[in-house]
């Protein structure tokens, strides 16, 4: 539908913004100056310190970025959850003493660092700034609900179609989810009805959700 296509185009645009201007390939940000082992992800963190900053489309670090510029930052600790496994990452704001950055994409780099990509919307944001985090909690909670729904859907598919059903891919966003799975034949209308019934019954049961790692 229209809303989905608009959201998809926003993600595509941001992905393009995070590509190298010269090669068109995803930017491999130069993190050699950072102590990667000291970086932390703490979803309860209220803020952190900017350890590195880049133009969104350039691998080489800079000291600061001004209003209107596309930027990418790494902080010593971050509360922003990176995208992964088909699930979108957190969005929100990074508030610096002299500026604000709107975070539109959060990714995990190949070296393990979490990087926040977006636009400086006010003033100047610089390396060394002590910053505060403002995560879009409503959006994050919507994504969490849809993440849980993929587990319910997977369990229901196994119950209706058989234990051979395995996840083959997924998309988890704030307004919808997609669950790809393996099966040897098309799902019938009756099987689909049963899957929907099982999932809806579990949702209506409003059971507590626990996280295990």
Locations of regions flagged by a protein language model:
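A glycine- and charged-residue-rich anion-binding loop/surface
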Residues: 1-213
């Amino acid at each position: 539908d229209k809303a989905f296509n608009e959201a998809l185009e926003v993600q595509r645009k941001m992905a393009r913004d995070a590509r190298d201007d010269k090669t068109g390939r995803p930017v491999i940000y130069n993190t050699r100056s950072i102590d990667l082992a000291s970086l932390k992800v703490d979803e309860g963190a209220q803020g952190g310190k900017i350890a590195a900053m880049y133009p969104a489309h350039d691998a080489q670090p800079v000291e600061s970025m001004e209003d209107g510029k596309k930027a990418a930052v790494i902080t010593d600790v971050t509360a922003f959850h990176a995208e992964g496994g088909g699930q979108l990452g957190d969005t929100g704001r990074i508030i610096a003493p002299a500026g604000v950055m709107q975070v539109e994409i959060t990714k995990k780099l190949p070296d393990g660092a979490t990087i926040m990509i977006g636009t400086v919307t006010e003033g100047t944001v610089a390396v060394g700034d002590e910053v505060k985090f403002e995560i879009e909690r409503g959006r994050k909670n919507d994504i969490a609900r849809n993440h849980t729904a993929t587990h319910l859907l997977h369990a229901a598919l196994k119950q209706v179609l058989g234990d051979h059903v395995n996840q083959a891919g997924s998309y988890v966003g704030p307004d919808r989810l997609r669950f790809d799975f393996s099966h040897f034949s098309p799902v019938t209308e009756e099987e689909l009805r049963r899957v929907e019934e099982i999932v809806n019954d579990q949702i209506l049961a409003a059971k507590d959700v626990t996280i295990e790692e």
